[in-house]
Amino acid sequence: MKFIDEARIEVIAGDGGDGSASMRREKFVPFGGPDGGDGGRGGSVYAVADRNINTLIDYRYSKKHQARNGENGRGSDCYGKGGDDITLRMPVGTIITDMDTGELIADLTEHNQTVRIAEGGAGGLGNLHFKSSTNRAPRQKTDGKPGERRMVRLELKVLADVGLLGMPNAGKSTFISSVSNAKPKIADYPFTTLAPNLGVVRVGPSRSFVIADIPGLIEGAAEGAGLGHQFLRHLQRTGLLLHIVDLAPFDETVDPVAEAKAIVNELRKYDEELFSKPRWLVLNKLDMVPEDEREARVAAFLKDFEWDGPVFEISALTGQGCENLCYAVYDYLAEHSDAQRAAEAEDLAADVRFRGQQQGDANAPVGPQE
């Protein structure tokens, strides 16, 4: 299935039905009074996150999604039927934005998360509601309200813990296929990867993390060159970036240091926040470097690249060094996850609504005071 991570659609909620102005007409009931029912509410449009969907292709060609209108009210106190709601199923990680106002409507981050993106109009009131002591036969009624109508932008950002960065043919797809259950296409030419791939890396029972491989970047990607710039958004939710560098390129004229610096520059141009994410350096294809030259080549690269962060030497093809890297990544993610939970607990403890519980008062109320 083709990978589509962006779409624009129009969602139209149903209009509310009109109220009815009707009088009760029955034999032996000379002054029946009003009996006009209310109109039904219009149907709403909902978005639901579904982990079994991984693309927005259903919305690339289906541009208009409209719920049904509510039925009009009728006499004999008959209320109009409400319009049926419609549900749009989208991948987990979809961001829904109003194109006219720029408002963030929803960020679908959990399976089965449901958000209303267009509300149906309220039904009108029948003349039954306007009866009073001075107006025993009201003729007034109200019309239904129109439903919301929106042009929305759908943007998919995959949910992954770790993202892979690197030039085309750096070995990213080989690495993700070596350490996870992902089976991306692998070949000896650039841009083999045309869409993001996700893989689950398991380091033990109930111990795993998700890794994302995106198409390789080239110089000028932030201005639109190549394929990588349009997929960089998929790395914005990650907690760690692995910068994979080919230390043994087939073309001897290629400088690994220059390529690595180009990746860093493109990252900075695209998004400063993404550039500031924790980043580890992974030197790949060391099986292609003679063993007696390996240490010197790694040292020379680190010196020229001016890198002082974590460094891992691997061979994605043979698996050398991959296991240690995966364990280190898992430990890092677990440590920072615990730190984040601790920070949230501190924020909660500082909340004035919970001070009673901190002081041991079991009867202290939770939540805002009246």
Swiss-Prot record:
<feature type="binding site">
    <location>
        <begin position="213"/>
        <end position="216"/>
    </location>
    <ligand>
        <name>GTP</name>
    </ligand>
</feature>
<keyword id="KW-0342">GTP-binding</keyword>
<comment type="subunit">
    <text>Monomer.</text>
</comment>
<feature type="binding site">
    <location>
        <position position="193"/>
    </location>
    <ligand>
        <name>Mg(2+)</name>
    </ligand>
</feature>
<feature type="binding site">
    <location>
        <begin position="191"/>
        <end position="195"/>
    </location>
    <ligand>
        <name>GTP</name>
    </ligand>
</feature>
<dbReference type="InterPro" id="IPR036726">
    <property type="entry name" value="GTP1_OBG_dom_sf"/>
</dbReference>
<dbReference type="InterPro" id="IPR027417">
    <property type="entry name" value="P-loop_NTPase"/>
</dbReference>
<feature type="binding site">
    <location>
        <position position="173"/>
    </location>
    <ligand>
        <name>Mg(2+)</name>
    </ligand>
</feature>
<dbReference type="GO" id="GO:0042254">
    <property type="term" value="P:ribosome biogenesis"/>
</dbReference>
<protein>
    <recommendedName>
        <fullName>GTPase Obg</fullName>
        <ecNumber>3.6.5.-</ecNumber>
    </recommendedName>
</protein>
<dbReference type="GO" id="GO:0005737">
    <property type="term" value="C:cytoplasm"/>
</dbReference>
<dbReference type="Pfam" id="PF01018">
    <property type="entry name" value="GTP1_OBG"/>
</dbReference>
<keyword id="KW-0547">Nucleotide-binding</keyword>
<keyword id="KW-0479">Metal-binding</keyword>
<dbReference type="InterPro" id="IPR006074">
    <property type="entry name" value="GTP1-OBG_CS"/>
</dbReference>
<dbReference type="InterPro" id="IPR006169">
    <property type="entry name" value="GTP1_OBG_dom"/>
</dbReference>
<dbReference type="GO" id="GO:0003924">
    <property type="term" value="F:GTPase activity"/>
</dbReference>
<feature type="binding site">
    <location>
        <begin position="166"/>
        <end position="173"/>
    </location>
    <ligand>
        <name>GTP</name>
    </ligand>
</feature>
<comment type="similarity">
    <text>Belongs to the TRAFAC class OBG-HflX-like GTPase superfamily. OBG GTPase family.</text>
</comment>
<dbReference type="GO" id="GO:0000287">
    <property type="term" value="F:magnesium ion binding"/>
</dbReference>
<keyword id="KW-0460">Magnesium</keyword>
<keyword id="KW-0963">Cytoplasm</keyword>
<dbReference type="Pfam" id="PF01926">
    <property type="entry name" value="MMR_HSR1"/>
</dbReference>
<dbReference type="InterPro" id="IPR045086">
    <property type="entry name" value="OBG_GTPase"/>
</dbReference>
<feature type="binding site">
    <location>
        <begin position="315"/>
        <end position="317"/>
    </location>
    <ligand>
        <name>GTP</name>
    </ligand>
</feature>
<dbReference type="GO" id="GO:0005525">
    <property type="term" value="F:GTP binding"/>
</dbReference>
<dbReference type="InterPro" id="IPR031167">
    <property type="entry name" value="G_OBG"/>
</dbReference>
<comment type="function">
    <text>An essential GTPase which binds GTP, GDP and possibly (p)ppGpp with moderate affinity, with high nucleotide exchange rates and a fairly low GTP hydrolysis rate. Plays a role in control of the cell cycle, stress response, ribosome biogenesis and in those bacteria that undergo differentiation, in morphogenesis control.</text>
</comment>
<feature type="domain" description="OBG-type G">
    <location>
        <begin position="160"/>
        <end position="334"/>
    </location>
</feature>
<dbReference type="InterPro" id="IPR014100">
    <property type="entry name" value="GTP-bd_Obg/CgtA"/>
</dbReference>
<keyword id="KW-0378">Hydrolase</keyword>
<feature type="domain" description="Obg">
    <location>
        <begin position="1"/>
        <end position="159"/>
    </location>
</feature>
<feature type="region of interest" description="Disordered">
    <location>
        <begin position="127"/>
        <end position="147"/>
    </location>
</feature>
<dbReference type="InterPro" id="IPR006073">
    <property type="entry name" value="GTP-bd"/>
</dbReference>
<feature type="binding site">
    <location>
        <begin position="284"/>
        <end position="287"/>
    </location>
    <ligand>
        <name>GTP</name>
    </ligand>
</feature>
